[in-house]
Swiss-Prot record:
Residues on Extracellular side: 40-128, 175-207
Positions on the Cytoplasmic side per record topology: 150-153
Domain of life: Eukaryota
InterPro entries, A to Z: TM2, TM2D1-3-like
Protein name: TM2 domain-containing protein 1
Family designation: Belongs to the TM2 family.
Keyword Glycoprotein found: yes
An example Gene Ontology molecular-function term: amyloid-beta binding
Transmembrane segments: 129-149, 154-174
Membrane topology: Multi-pass membrane protein
Tissues with expression: Widely expressed.
Length: 207
């Protein structure tokens, strides 16, 4: 009687074949071929906010004539419309992937603005120059005690008036409520710089 041929591989061979198949599948999906396939078919589109400088242009903010600050200034922040360059494809502020032609708004960029409360820089300087010896500048800025003291001492015999004029002109002394002066948006403003954790410090190179 002839021996029958085995109908399939033995148990060890079957386990080995399955293990090799699993390893091959993992190497294809996670290796360089899988990365190429993912980048070719499933690459996520870039957000418009992450575009590089030169790939978009932003409009100048609309300035309020009364406050000389952007009209939508809230919590020291305003937003301006930004337009991606033509032939740029990215996700807009609504999350929709869009191919831009240069005329569509892609995102709104936040810009810093100041809190003002009706105190004009020009008025403060004029009061300090002409009526500083009467304390009018201090009364205007919300310092009634110092204003009364200057009034009673004729501006500390003129010395206090001169010091106040310098401090107000340099925008060191401001309104008592902590707000900023109303100054022309594109005029001369004092910008205070501070060092934070994000400040880039360039190494000094000496010859």
């Amino acid at each position: 009687m002839a021996a029958a041929w085995p109908s399939g591989p033995s148990a060890p061979e079957a386990v080995t074949a399955r293990l090799v198949g699993v390893l091959w599948f993992v190497s294809v999906t996670t290796g360089p071929w899988g990365a190429v396939a993912t980048s070719a078919g499933g690459e996520e589109s870039l957000k418009c906010e992450d575009l590089k400088v030169g790939q978009y242009i932003c409009k100048d903010p609309k300035i309020n004539d009364a406050t000389q600050e952007p009209v939508n200034c809230t919590n020291y922040t305003a937003h301006v419309s930004c337009f991606p360059a033509p032939n740029i494809t990215c996700k807009d502020s609504s999350g929709n992937e869009t191919h831009f032609t240069g005329n569509e708004v892609g995102f709104f960029k936040p810009i810093s603005c100041r809190n003002v409360n009706g105190y004009s820089y020009k008025v403060a300087v004029a009061l300090s120059l002409f009526l500083g010896w009467l304390g009018a500048d201090r009364f205007y800025l919300g310092y009634p005690a110092l204003g009364l003291l200057k009034f009673c001492t004729v501006g500390f015999c003129g010395i206090g008036s001169l010091i106040d004029f310098i401090l107000i002109s340099m925008q060191i002394v401001g309104p008592s409520d902590g707000s900023s002066y109303i100054i022309d948006y594109y005029g001369t403003r004092l910008t205070r710089l501070s060092i934070t954790n994000e400040t880039f410090r360039k190494t000094q190179l000496y010859p």
